Amino acid sequence: MALRKSNDTVEALGVGYQIPRNSLGLLMVAQAFVVLPHAAHITPWIIAVGLFCGCWRWMVFQGRWDYPQRWIKVLLVVASAIGVGVSGQNVFSLETATGLLIVAFALKLVEMKSRRDAYLVIHLCYFIIAAEFLFDQSIGIALYGAVAMVFVTAAFVGLHQLQTRVRASTSLRTAAVLVMQAVPLMLVLFLFFPRIAPLWSVPLPGGTRTGISDHIAPGDIAALTRSDAIAFRAVFDGPVPVSHDRYWRGLVYSKFMRGIWSVGGVPNAPENQPARPNSPSEYLPAHSGISPLSYQVLLEPTQSNWLFALDVAMPVTHGTALTRDFRLIASDPVHTLFRYRAEAYPAAVTDVELPGWLRDRETQLPESDNARTVAFARELASRSKTPEDFLAAVLRYIRTEPFFYTLNPPLLGDADSIDAFWFDSRRGFCSHYAGALVYLARAVGIPARMIGGYQGGDINPVTGHLVVRQFDAHAWAEVWLDGRGWVRMDPTAAVAPARIESGLDAALSETDRAVLSAITGSRFAGIPGLKDILYVFESIQHRWNLRVVGYDTDMQTRYLSDLLGEVTPTRVGVVMLLGGGVSLGLVALSLFWRRRSVADHPAQRAFRRFAQRLGRIGLARLPDETPGRFLARVNTVRKRAPAEIAPLIAHLDSLLYNPDVTCTREALRRLRGGLRRLQVDVTLRARL
C-alpha cells in the first residue's frame, strides 16, 4: 500500500516516474500496428506525423531529447487540426474524424509521462483498432485487429509488472491469454445481444464509387473490365441458372443526349410514382402459377441505392422496393456490405399495356442527331412487316457485317456518335451495340431502353455461390412489343455470342485477352493449383460475409427462433446469462488452474514438505509468514548466525519469485539438500 501511494505521489508531481522499458517498447510496436491499416484511407502526412511522434517519444525515453515545451505542443495541435481539415474532402466525413483521432493519439504519445497518460494512449489504441472496421470488415482485417489487440494489451500488462527485467514475450503471452479468455463472452454478446438501431448515424465510407453509373458514355462499360473487384455474391436456394440467363438488372437508361445515355427524369409521368419500400405496387407483373427463383445477394458498397437482381425481381428484404421500370432499389445508399433477398419470375410479362406517358419516354430522340442512323432504320422498317421482323433484321445485320467486339473501341464525338459507330468504326463494346439497337428501335417508333448491370459470373466450386466481378459489367437493350411487354434483346450475343455463354474472356481477341489478364487476377489462372487455392480463400471470405458481417436483425431473429422457439425477452435473457456464466466460469477455472500450477512449483513442494515436518516437532509456520521469514526463525531457534542461513533463503526466493531463474534439477537438488540438513539439525536439537 505504501508503495502504491508513493507511486501515485510521484506521478502526480510528473517527475521521477519512468514507464517500464518493456511496456514502452510494446506500446511503440502497438502504435505502428494500429495505425498501419488506416494508411489506405487517410492522407500520408498523418501517418508520417504518427511515426515522427513515435520516434520522438523513444528519444525522450533514451534521454537524448526532452519533452516538447507548451508552445510547441500548442503549435503542433493547431497545425495538425488545420491540416486534417484542409486535407479532408468533407470536414464532417468519417475519414476526417479518424485522421483527427490518429493525430491526437500520436501527439499524446509524445507528452506521455505518467501511468495515467499511458492508460489514455492505450485506450486510444483500442478505439483506433475499432475505427478500422468502419472502413473494412474483411476477415483479414479482423485477424489483423486481433493481433494488434494482443500487442496493445501486452503494453497494458507491462505497466503493471514490477520486475525490472521482464521479457516482452512474457507480456505478450499474458495478453494473448487475456484476449482468448474474452472470446467466449464476446461470442455470446455477438449472437444474443439485441441489434438496436442507432439514434443517429453518419454515412459510412465504402471507398470511391465503383461499378455501374447512372449515365453511360461509349467506353464506360469497357473501362470497368479493368477491375476484377467483386461487385456482389449471390447464393441461390436451388441450382444456379445457366450463364445466358444470368442478367443482373441494375439501371434503366431512357434519356439520350450528346452521346450519353442516362437515367434522366420521367417526362409527363403521373404523380405518386416513386417506389415505396415494402409496399404493394399496382404495376407489379402478374406471376401467379410461375415458380420463383429464390436467392440472396451480398452487395459490396456502391455509395448508391440501386440493387442488382434477375428479371423479373420481387423484393423480399425489408427496406427494398421495386421501381416503375422494374429495378430493385434500397431505401438508403449502400455504404457497407448489404444483404438482401429477392425472387425472380423469368416468365412474368411486364407492361402488357404500355401507358402513353411511358411510351413517350421510351421513344424520345434528340432532334437533328444521327441522321444516317435514322434514315437506315426507316429504310429497314419499310422492308419489315412487324417490329419483330425489324429487330431480327438489325441483329442479322450485326452478324453479317464486319462489326468487332473489343475492349479498346475508338473514341466517338458527342454529336452523331451512333452514326460514327454504326457506319464508320464498327468497333465497340456492349454499350455501343445496346445503344445503337435502342436508337434504331426508337427511330421507327418502337419503345426501347438500355439496361445496365452485370451478366454471367463465376461459380465457386467450394461453396457453390456465384461471384460477380466488375469485369462482368454489361449493357443490353429492352424493347416493348405488343402482347409481349418488355422483351430483353442483347445485340452483344449477335457479334460475340461467347460473351454471353462463356464470359468476357472467351469473347475477346488474343490482344484484348492479354490486356485483361495483365490487369486482373486472371493472369494467375494458368498456374496449376493456384485457382483452386483462390477459390478456397474466396469461399472463406464469403462465409465470413454471410455469417459474421451479414449477421443482422433478421438473421438473429431466425437463429433465435430455431434455438428457442418463441423469442421472448425472458428466454433471450436466460440464454445470455447462461452463456455469460459459462464464459466467466471458464475464466475462473483458468485462474484456479494457474494458481494451482504455481502452488505445485517444485521448489514450493519441497518447502511445503519441509514446513510440515518441522510442524510435527513444534515449529509450525505462521499463516502470514513468508518462506524466507520462516527459515530465518528456524535458524534463530537453532542459535546460528544469520549469515549461515542467508544463502539458502536467497536460493529459495530466487526459485520462487524470480521469473528469469529456471528451476533446474541441479538447483532443486541443492535446495532439497539445504532444507534436509536444516531439518536434521533442528530435529536433533529438539530431541536433545
Residue ranges, per PLM feature:
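Transmembrane-cytosolic junction motif
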Residues: 587-609
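Active-site neighborhood of thiol-dependent amide/isopeptide-bond enzymes
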Residues: 380-475, 596-599, 638
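Linear, non-domain "peripheral" regions
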Residues: 1-210, 317-339
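Short, surface-exposed glycine/acidic/tryptophan-bearing loops
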Residues: 67-73, 333-335, 341, 345-375, ...
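Membrane-interface segments at or immediately adjacent to transmembrane helices
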Residues: 178-269
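Membrane-proximal, non-transmembrane interaction modules
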Residues: 452, 471, 492-493, 581-583, ...
